[in-house]
Structures are given as structure tokens and as C-alpha cells.
């Protein structure tokens, strides 16, 4: 009887040690390196969720790639919504600081993106709440760079940083 209690105590002790090591490592990884997120809505169609409401894509979000605010035109990024800080949104980077962009439905026809900001838009114009609604976005709101579609399996792919030709900045700041 005493021998079986010793085994149980050793098992519980080993489990607790593993738990108290694994949880901080997992939390740090998910917070600082990468995580996954389900994409909802039509704003990024056809790049993400091409099937509409029938299925949601699940993407890999790489926090490491945006740690120094290193983003490029065409990148698909996750950011904190400028209108609702509780919500994260996924959009494509259209313009970087210093670029002049032709807007779609914004109060100004042309906008020069201020220092420390980016211009983001959804691929499905007219179905996207983006910089055309709220203006340039502070780089401080960047959360992660979407790098791959993980789900559904038939859509496994790397997400390319491609800027639609019709959305090229009118004038680019020299890099």
C-alpha cells in the first residue's frame, strides 16, 4: 500500500514539474514567436476565406517578423483594430510611411502615410473595414505577419506578399 502511494506521489510531482515548465514555455512561444488564428469574414477574399461563410481559413501568425516593425507592401498582417482594441483584424499592407496612396472612399482622395504608420486594406473592397475607413494605422498596433494558411488542408500554402497592381502607391518613399 505504501509503495503504491509513493508511485502516485512521484507521478504527481513529475506532472507538476512538467506542467510548470511547459505552460510558461507555451505561453511565451504563443505570445512572442507564433500562433494560429481563424480568419472570419469576407474582407480578405479571395486571398483568405474564398468560400465565404462555408469555411474559415486558419492562418499562422508570425510575431517574430514584425518585432522591429519590418513590414513590406503586400504583406498580410494582423493588427489591433484602431476602432476596437479588443479585436484583431487581418489586412494587406498597401503603403508604408512616406508613400502617397489613392484612397477608395476615404474623405481625402490622396493620403500621405505619416511617419510610424502604414496603410492597410482588405482585398475585397466594399466589404472591408480598413484604412479607407479609419486612415493610416500606427505601427504600434501591428500584432503579427500572416505567413501560411494551415486549414483547411486543401488550402495549405504560403501567403505571398503581393500588392495588387491597382493598389500601388501613387508615390513611394525611397527605401
UniProtKB/Swiss-Prot annotation:
Transmembrane segments: 19-37
SUPFAM superfamilies, alphabetized: LexA/Signal peptidase
The protein's Enzyme Commission number: 3.4.21.-
UniProt entry tagged with the keyword Iron: no
InterPro entries associated with the record: IMP2 (IPR037730), LexA/Signal_pep-like_sf (IPR036286), Pept_S26A_signal_pept_1 (IPR000223), Pept_S26A_signal_pept_1_CS (IPR019758), Peptidase_S26 (IPR019533)
Gene Ontology molecular function, alphabetical: endopeptidase activity; peptidase activity; serine-type endopeptidase activity
Active-site residue numbers: 43, 91
Disulfide bonds: none
Cellular location(s): Mitochondrion inner membrane
Pfam families per the UniProt record, alphabetical: Peptidase_S26 (PF10502)
GO biological process, one term: respiratory electron transport chain
Complex and partners: Heterodimer of 2 subunits, IMMPL1 and IMMPL2.
Family: Belongs to the peptidase S26 family. IMP2 subfamily.
Disease named in the record: Gilles de la Tourette syndrome: Neurologic disorder manifested particularly by motor and vocal tics and associated with behavioral abnormalities.
Function: Catalyzes the removal of transit peptides required for the targeting of proteins from the mitochondrial matrix, across the inner membrane, into the inter-membrane space. Known to process the nuclear encoded protein DIABLO.
Protein name: Mitochondrial inner membrane protease subunit 2
Record gene name: IMMP2L
